[in-house]
From Swiss-Prot:
Family designation: Belongs to the peptidase A2 family. HERV class-II K(HML-2) subfamily.
Residue ranges of every copy of the Peptidase A2 domain listed in the record: 21-96
UniProt-recorded name of the protein: Endogenous retrovirus group K member 8 Pro protein
Catalytic activity: Processing at the authentic HIV-1 PR recognition site and release of the mature p17 matrix and the p24 capsid protein, as a result of the cleavage of the -SQNY-|-PIVQ- cleavage site
Organism name: Homo sapiens
Active-site residues from the entry: D26
Sequence ranges assigned to domain G-patch in this UniProt record: 111-156
Modifications the protein undergoes after translation, according to the UniProt entry: Autoproteolytically processed at the N-terminus. Expected C-terminal autoprocessing not detected. The sequence shown is that of the processed Pro protein.
Assembly notes: Active as a homodimer.
Amino acid sequence: WASQVSENRPVCKAIIQGKQFEGLVDTGADVSIIALNQWPKNWPKQKAVIGLVGIGTASEVYQSMEILHCLGPDNQESTVQPMITSIPLNLWGRDLLQQWGAEITMPAPLYSPTSQKIMTKRGYIPGKGLGKNEDGIKIPFEAKINQKREGIGYPF
């Protein structure tokens, strides 16, 4: 699973105890939180002994009574004992993200600053493809040397 930072929120799916949940990837959250309205009624929960900070004022905060089996977005095996409260969407915190091997990368530019300026002046929008409808190739392709020395591609 990969997500480029954009106007869209980075959400992904996880399967907890066989039930699928969608949640927001939240690197600022220490723990994962399941929305109270999505928590299955037959799954045991208990009043949390600690409160949640950073999500506003949550009047009812629970925690799963059990450590639950979880499969990440690419079937990474993990376990979680999520918090449960009234929030609009589930949050995948660092407790799960670390187990899933999540990374944040900021790749070095593929092109020189000069070529980037030229492309921007010509109307190129990063993340969009080239062409009239911006639907062309979005990532550079890798040139391959013709090892059989046939046709174009063999360096003389």
